[in-house]
Every structure is written in C-alpha cells, then in structure tokens.
Regions:
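Beta/alpha (TIM)-barrel catalytic core signal, keyed to glycine-rich beta->alpha loops juxtaposed to Asp/Glu
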Residues: 4-127
Length: 128
C-alpha cells in the first residue's frame, strides 16, 4: 500500500521508491493498493472531519486524481474514508477511458486547489 497522487509524484525519491515497490509487487503477482489519491491537504486544527486529510471536492480535479492512479494498470485504487465522495470517485473510475490525465492539468489542479503533499517531514512524521 502506498500513496499515489500528483503531489507525491513531484518528489523524485518517493517516485523511485514507489517504482521499485510496484515492480516488486508486479513480479510477484501482488496488487499494490494506493491511498490518499484524492487528498488535497491536511486539515488544520479545526472541527472533526470524516478523514484526517481534506479531500478534493467532486469535480474535474477529483476525476483527474482518480485517472492518475488508474492510468497505471499495476495499481489498485482505494477510495477515501469520506464516504460522501464515493459516488464521485466511482463515477470517475467508470468513465476512465484508459488515458492518463494531462500533466499540465494535474499541475494546474495542484495550483488552483492548493494540493500539497500530506507528508512533508513535519509533525505527523515525527521529525518536528
């Protein structure tokens, strides 16, 4: 199981680790589950939520986040723990046409929706 989203894909060391893990799983016939694919950012110190991270809202950015994972046939997409997004996630998966989303559109999504890596070496990772 690993995180697979466009923000983490900007981190070369992480990408190399995931590529090695994917190849290992593929060689052994093991499915590689992905998590946090529709994550936008960590929630701040606010009221309780359905997940510990803020997911993308239903729409084109969420659809592209789903497509980003599904474009790699060796990966398995897990849905967010926020069940309210299940219909939008399933719809995006059903509409997936086999093509990876455009890298420029993913970059635009990261900017417009302020998508950031959930793991930044901070408090959650025990390094602060």
């Amino acid at each position: 199981m690993c995180i697979r989203d466009s923000a983490m894909a900007e981190q070369p060391d992480y990408v190399a680790d995931v590529d090695r893990l994917t190849a290992h799983c593929d060689a052994h016939g093991v499915a590689l589950q992905t998590i946090k694919s529709v994550a936008r950012c960590r929630w701040g110190d606010t009221d309780p939520h359905f997940s510990w991270y803020e997911p993308l809202a239903p729409g084109d950015a969420l659809r592209r986040a789903v497509e980003f994972v599904l474009a790699n046939p060796r990966l398995f997409l897990n849905t967010t723990s926020d069940a309210r997004l299940l219909p939008a996630t399933i719809d995006a998966a059903q509409r997936f046409d086999g093509r990876a989303p455009d890298a420029a559109m993913l970059a635009q999504d990261r900017t417009e929706h302020r998508i950031v890596s959930l793991f930044d070496g901070g408090l959650l990772e025990g390094t602060r």
